[in-house]
Amino acid sequence: MKIGIITAMSSEQKQVAQLLENKKEYTEGPFQYTEGSIRNNTIILMKCGIGKVNAAAGTVELIRTFQPDCVISTGVAGGIDSCLKIMDVVVSRQIVYHDVWCGEGNMYGQIQGLPARFEGNATLFDCAMSLDTPTAIHGGLICSGDKFITDRSELNDIKEKFHEGLAVDMESGAIAQICYIYKVPVSYTHLRAHETT
C-alpha cells in the first residue's frame, strides 16, 4: 500500500520520519518530502505548512504526484473536551470547519455544495482505535479552522456549535475537503499538545 502522510510543521515531519526505513529526503516546489517504508508499505511523508491553504495545496500535489491509496493527516492539536489529557491521541470519525458560514440553507461549518462534515475512512479509523498502546486514544469530531485557538470565548463558541468536538487544528478540514473531491480515503490522527479547555 502507498500511504501519504501530511504534517504541517518540520518538528512533526521529523518525528514521523524517525519511524521510516530506507529514507530519502527531497524538496519539490514549496513542499518537503521524506519517502520511505514501514513494513511492506510505501510512505510519502510531506510537510505542507500551516493553515488551510497550505494544506489544500499540499494535498492536491501529493495526490496528483504520488496517487496514494490513502492520506493520513497527523500532528499536534488543541483539546477542547475535558476528557482529553495532554499527550492523548485523537482520531477523527468526522471533521468539520469551525470557521465557515455560507448563509441560509447551509449548516454552520458547511461549504455550500459539500457535506456538512467530512467522514474519516472507517477502516483507517477502526485500525487506529484498535491499537494496543498505553496512550489513550479517543475517536470523534475534529474542528478545523485558520486560527490557533487560545481565547476562551472563541473556544466556548466552537463548543456551542459543535458540542461533541474533541480537538481543534488548522489543516485537517482542508485535507478532508481535497480528499473528498479526489475520492481518496483519509484519516486524521492528532496528539493533544496544548491546553485550550
Enumerate the predicted regions with their spans.
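N-terminal short beta-loop-beta anion/metal-coordinating cradle
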Residues: M1-V60, F66
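Conserved active-site and cofactor/substrate-binding residues in soluble primary-metabolism enzymes
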Residues: A8-S11, I50-A57, F66, L84, ...
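Glycine-rich phosphate-binding loop signature in dinucleotide/nucleotide-binding domains
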Residues: R64-Q67, V184
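Structural motif
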Residues: C70-I72
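Mid-sequence, gly/pro-rich, charge-dense loop/helix-turn segments that line enzyme active sites
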Residues: I80-H163, A167
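Short glycine-rich, acidic/polar surface loops and turns
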Residues: D169-S187
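Single conserved hydrophobic/aromatic residue that forms the stacking wall/gate
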Residues: H190-T197
